[in-house]
Amino acid sequence: MASSPLPGPNDILLASPSSAFQPDTLSQPRPGHANLKPNQVGQVILYGIPIVSLVIDGQERLCLAQISNTLLKNFSYNEIHNRRVALGITCVQCTPVQLEILRRAGAMPISSRRCGMITKREAERLCKSFLGENRPPKLPDNFAFDVSHECAWGCRGSFIPARYNSSRAKCIKCSYCNMYFSPNKFIFHSHRTPDAKYTQPDAANFNSWRRHLKLTDKSPQDELVFAWEDVKAMFNGGSRKRALPQPGAHPACHPLSSVKAAAVAAAAAVAGGGGLLGPHLLGAPPPPPPPPPPLAELAGAPHAHHKRPRFDDDDDSLQEAAVVAAASLSAAAASLSVAAASGGAGTGGGGAGGGCVAGVGVGAGAGAGAGAGAKGPRSYPVIPVPSKGSFGGVLQKFPGCGGLFPHPYTFPAAAAAFSLCHKKEDAGAAAEALGGAGAGGAGAAPKAGLSGLFWPAGRKDAFYPPFCMFWPPRTPGGLPVPTYLQPPPQPPSALGCALGESPALLRQAFLDLAEPGGAAGSAEAAPPPGQPPQVVANGPGSGPPPPAGGAGSRDALFESPPGGSGGDCSAGSTPPADSVAAAGAGAAAAGSGPAGSRVPAPHHPHLLEGRKAGGGSYHHSSAFRPVGGKDDAESLAKLHGASAGAPHSAQTHPHHHHHPHHHHHHHHPPQPPSPLLLLPPQPDEPGSERHHPAPPPPPPPPPPPPLAQHPHHRGLLSPGGTSCCYPSEDSSEDEDDEEEEQEVDVEGHKPPEGEEEEEGRDPDDDEEEDEETEVLLGDPLVGGGRFLQGRGPSEKGSSRDRAPAVAGAFPLGLNSSRLLQEDGKLGDPGSDLPPPPPPPLAPQKASGGGSSSPGSPVHHPSLEEQPSYKDSQKTKENNQVIVSTKDDNSFSDKNKEHSFFITDSDASGGDFWRERSGEHTQETNSPHSLKKDVENMGKEELQKVLFEQIDLRRRLEQEFQVLKGNTSFPVFNNFQDQMKRELAYREEMVQQLQIIPYAASLIRKEKLGAHLSKS
């Protein structure tokens, strides 16, 4: 706060900028210890607010309830309690007599039954953690605390605050062995000296070091004690944010932030990129400091920042601020379209700030304003609890991701990777400036550009997945990122958009988080944010994408909710630029989420997409099933090379379709590098991605595809392309089930039902049957989409196209000829898609509707799908109901275990059932021979079995749907729901396993026969 430029907040919060508390002011009322009489009433001025004090046991204590109701009124009791516990502040209950005194003194309401009293010093620390500058205590550079603990045989060491930059930092040097330990580990480290007595650690758990680690000096000076308290509070629960104070970022000042929201927004605008960082925190940080942060963040700050991402859990305000800020930032960015942004920001409660910011044109300002504003009104409510429970604290943990805190991977590379993406929040100004796409923030553009370039600016949640925890974006470096997170990248954008938009949007944003497609859907659903993106998307470089106006916006929304949307498109249009921008990392591409605004920005598919690109090898698609790794992808690529007819070309293609895809380009473009990206798509004209071929308007929906995109080239389709992470399996799934191996990849895609029962016959996926219930994705066309996304993502671009085709005509090709199926089927399911070649894309688009980009609920779903899938999917996707984004059951005959799970995903509209079973990990084992064998299999028998299974699955699906409730499946609010749904599906599938052995034996026989005949 000290650095906060706003006098208002400063006056309110702290009299003296240098220190949160003004000792004089604080001690002024205090008479003097000698004179303290029991139950003596006094008054202490905390942050300019008079607080009643009472002398209890010779100590002046303040009424916690009064502090909570005045200074901390913007924070929930829960937040305050958690922070108090985290700070190790014990509350003394006052006696009935003391309570009456407090009531009469006006500190407590008459109805109060009890009151906790805390010392003045504790009150100062508590308020400071919420309102004060959140910087670690100022200590000499080479300062170290002499600390010791008595656990086990005890130990002594030097706690070096300068090294304490994360909760796990090795900052304690053992005095005996001179090794460095983290505080958590140090209490378990002891040297058995002759005189040492063993002490059973008293419930020494990893976070109890603050209780066990004591200053060795028994009577330390007060300054030392206070500094030690501050240090101990650093990465602890609520005050965690204080851990990595940025020069310009004072994330802790939430109230201030709300107060300062408007001023800060303006300041942030002034500060430009720098402002973003500060604002990123609460919009409260003074603009001056913020500017440094951006650079610092880029350069060295990343250390702090990237560590910082351990956002306070308790710090609700922070969390809210982060989420809200991210949302509002994102909204602000989205607010590129000022209207949308303003609306979003306003919604947050930081609305005024957000709107103001939007007006200002500074994404950062907007973010700050929104965040701060939200704070004031208490953004807390704005963020549905999903943040807390459903994502296992993801929200809390990664609100920063949302944009409050530096991205967990804040290293510059990450900045490069995500900055583009996050830039989208800046979208309006920054992103556009960067992308030059549009012209959302004229004035802010320059600054925005900067911010977009640097974490600080981009960090708004736009570029970050709001919940890094579950979906850390794949970094360019290939940091492994669990794909199961789905489209984390989207969340940021979607989150930002949604958040910015309104609580409802917020909710959708969360859903999006849960389901990449969902996010897209929700974003789409929320045109306001989407539209701005739409503009951007069309503007930036989305030559093909623009065609789908709505799509663009939606895409953009999904991809780069606010300003990035254009980026996605543009990325698609300028894949090369993307790749360049990506800088060798899909991350960069993903990062360029805002690419929308800056065409060059990598298509900014999702971070996920980026991940895919970046962490090609890591393609954990589903939480449940492993997906083939790079090797698989490569082998698949090889397989496809021939069958797909040019995986390499696909590469370029991907770009194209993706492009057309709009965001689908996400799928591929992000990873143009992947040779297999979109072999199949190749059929489509690059320009008119299948998506395009399909109803062009729908293509926009594909934003989710980004994931797929990467997956495309990444055999690991982390997100399964289409669906969330789960779909990843798809991509792994062997998108290469190309016709080459006419596996029984029956992508049954019921055209009418939009059912994409893709029977994954992924060669690579022998038992890859990833039953990846793409719950999240829930692309009705999972098959197509899945292929688009999953397949496309997978190295088996071609197969993936095929799959879509198959999906198109689910009954049609088992896999007699994936290609044929693809083309033929294509038309079939995707009646939308006019030409078969496009069909692969189109059907994905069409029949898959969102399949290609599961994330995009609105794929031009196939005919029937389109409407129902679109709407339903939108909702569903938003809700993440679409379980099976990758419907293909790829049963890869490779492993005799070809999975036949054709899981019908929930019908989005209820219309289509997608099979959720994804292929299991695609196995790269002898994919070629197996493929051929499978081709030679008794296709008829297999088809029969498969169809039976599909029927069964469909029935199950329906029952499941009924059980689940309305078709829109709002049920899929969160990750846990998703998991439950997936598990339920799995159980159902297990019941179907009886069929599998039969089919498996058939396949085995066929394979044996084929082998014999071949040999």
Swiss-Prot record:
Pfam families: c-SKI_SMAD_bind, Ski_Sno_DHD
InterPro entries: c-SKI_SMAD4-bd_dom, DNA-bd_dom_put_sf, SAND-like_dom_sf, SKI/SNO/DAC, Ski_DNA-bd_sf, Tscrpt_reg_SKI_SnoN
Basic and acidic residues bias (residue ranges): 628-637, 793-803, 861-877, 885-899, 912-922
SMART domains assigned: c-SKI_SMAD_bind
Tissues expressing this chain: Expressed in cerebellum, spinal cord and testis. Isoform 2 is present in cerebellum (at protein level).
Gene Ontology biological process terms from the UniProt entry: cell development; cerebellar Purkinje cell differentiation; negative regulation of BMP signaling pathway; negative regulation of transcription by RNA polymerase II; negative regulation of transforming growth factor beta receptor signaling pathway; positive regulation of smoothened signaling pathway; regulation of cerebellar granule cell precursor proliferation; regulation of dendrite morphogenesis
Region (Disordered): 280-316, 518-934
Sequence ranges of Acidic residues compositional bias: 730-745, 754-774
Subcellular location: Nucleus; Cytoplasm
Biased composition (Low complexity): 575-600
Keyword field: Cytoplasm, Nucleus, Repressor, Transcription, Transcription regulation
Main subcellular localisation: nucleus
Composition bias type Pro residues, residue spans: 284-295, 670-684, 694-708, 832-842
Molecular functions (GO terms): chromatin binding; DNA-binding transcription factor activity, RNA polymerase II-specific; histone deacetylase binding; RNA polymerase II cis-regulatory region sequence-specific DNA binding; sequence-specific double-stranded DNA binding; SMAD binding
Biased segments, Basic residues type: 653-669
Superkingdom to which the source organism belongs: Eukaryota
Gene Ontology CC, one term: transcription regulator complex
Assembly and binders: Interacts with SMAD2 and SMAD3.
Family: Belongs to the SKI family.
Function: Exhibits transcriptional repressor activity. Acts as a TGF-beta antagonist in the nervous system.
Name the record gives this protein: SKI family transcriptional corepressor 2
Organism field: Homo sapiens (Human)
Source lineage: Eukaryota, Metazoa, Chordata, Craniata, Vertebrata
